[in-house]
UniProtKB/Swiss-Prot annotation:
InterPro entries: DiS-bond_Isoase_DsbC/G (IPR033954), DiS-bond_isomerase_DsbC/G_N (IPR018950), DiS-bond_isomerase_DsbC/G_N_sf (IPR009094), Thiol:disulfide_interchange (IPR051470), Thioredoxin-like_fold (IPR012336), Thioredoxin-like_sf (IPR036249), Thioredoxin_CS (IPR017937)
Location(s), subcellular: Periplasm
Disulphide bridges, residue numbers: C119-C122
Record-level GO cellular component terms: periplasmic space
Keyword Nucleus tagged: no
CDD domains linked to this entry: DsbA_DsbC_DsbG
Keyword Hydrolase carried by entry: no
Signal sequence residues: 1-21
SUPFAM superfamilies per the UniProt record, alphabetical: DsbC/DsbG N-terminal domain-like, Thioredoxin-like
Record keywords, A-Z: Disulfide bond, Periplasm, Redox-active center, Signal
Family membership: Belongs to the thioredoxin family. DsbC subfamily.
Protein's gene: dsbC
UniProt protein name: Thiol:disulfide interchange protein DsbC
Length: 237
């Protein structure tokens, strides 16, 4: 028994060493390109790793010699599945406590919207919130300042997200009533970085519960129809 335990420990150490060696090669290759990785994980493809960076998701061979940028799709089922964004959903849900939520009384769907208070179509979407909610669509907001993290929009949205009543502060900003300065430990950069990783490049960007991203504004009825159809397709019904 003792010998078997020692052998298991030895094998674990060997495989751990191999994993760290692979990661080291990957980090070295990324460093040459000026890319900083936040996390390296296993990928669905043998011989490759998934690398999370602040500028998106990469797939890198274990030896660090080849890099693929962009989403990976699983086409083994009836419909393609974006496995890259599906992976990122755990990070999105980790920000749930920071989201500004408009919950539908009879919830049928939940969407997460990356928004910017300076975006015209974001205003249009928010003006129709009662219609989305009436159709059973719960809307959760994360901030995505299009002009960057040092912009006035970023500062204003941080104040909104730090307000005692975030929903009222957001409603007021969208109604043109201005933003009252406030501070807290909410980091808008986390919202922004996740948006970039999900492939968001403009607002509003609507993320479904499985990581599928719908770029741009969708009216309440159009959104409901799309969500119903998407749910049917992905559930196989």
């Amino acid at each position: 028994m003792k010998k078997r335990f020692m052998m298991f420990t030895l094998l674990a150490a060997v495989f751990s060493g191999v994993a760290h060696a692979d990661d080291a090669a990957i980090r070295q290759s990324l460093a040459k390109l000026g890319v900083q990785s936040t996390e390296i994980q296993a990928s669905p493809v043998a011989g490759m790793k998934t690398v999370l960076t602040h500028s998106g998701v990469l797939y890198v061979t274990d030896d660090g010699k080849h890099i693929i940028q962009g989403p990976m799709y699983d086409v083994s089922g009836a419909h393609p599945v974006n496995v890259t964004n599906k992976l990122l959903m755990s990070q999105l849900n980790a920000l749930e406590k920071e989201m500004i939520v408009y919950k539908a009384p009879d919830e049928k769907h939940v969407i997460t919207v990356f928004t910017d208070i300076t975006c015209g179509y974001c205003h249009k979407l928010h003006e129709e919130m009662k219609d989305y909610n009436a159709l059973g669509i719960t809307v959760r907001y994360l901030a995505f300042p299009r002009q960057g993290l040092e912009s006035q929009a970023e500062q204003d949205m941080k104040s909104i997200w730090c307000a005692k009543d975030k929903n009222k502060a957001f409603d007021d900003a969208m109604a043109g009533k201005g933003v009252k300065p406030a501070s807290c430990d909410v980091n808008i950069a986390d919202h922004y970085a996740l948006g970039v990783q999900l492939g968001v490049s403009g607002t509003p960007a609507i993320v479904l519960s499985n990581g599928y991203v719908v770029p741009g504004y969708q009216g309440p009825k159009e959104m409901k129809a799309f969500l119903d159809e998407h749910q049917k397709q992905t559930s196989g019904k």
